[in-house]
Amino acid sequence: MTWRTWYKEHLFTPEQAVQQIKSGQRVVVAHACGEPSIILDALVAHAAQYENVEIIHMVAMGKAAYCQPQYDKNFHHNAFFLGGSTRAAAAEGRVDFTPVYFSEIPNLLREDLRPNVTLLQCSPPDAHGYVSLGVSVDYTKPAAEASDLVIAQVNQNMPRTL
């Protein structure tokens, strides 16, 4: 099977992709410009099918709708850093805050907070079938390597990095 055939067989809508996430799982979301907003929107849109999904995120750059009070039974956010979209939920005691040095996050995800699923953005495949995490390699790469499942939002505008 060529990589092109494999790739076509693994293309899903965001709604189909989030169906792979199960209640009680730990989900790591890529950081900053790597945050897959379309996948997160689909996850929140299907919140009723989830219970106690832990979402680990650095600084949520998007709306972080999963931190809204109506989703408290569906999602539990564990933040390494707090930002504008998560700070109020943390102040209300609805978000866990795990203080950690940025440099320690890869080992934390490999050893102590091993994810079931990683949500990220990537570039389209190159001529050899390789994708790039672009501007979000930081803890995203070790999270993806440690995960049982990676759900990627392919972004035509994600630059290729080595």
Label for each model-derived stretch:
Residues 1-162:
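Conserved alpha/beta enzyme-core scaffold
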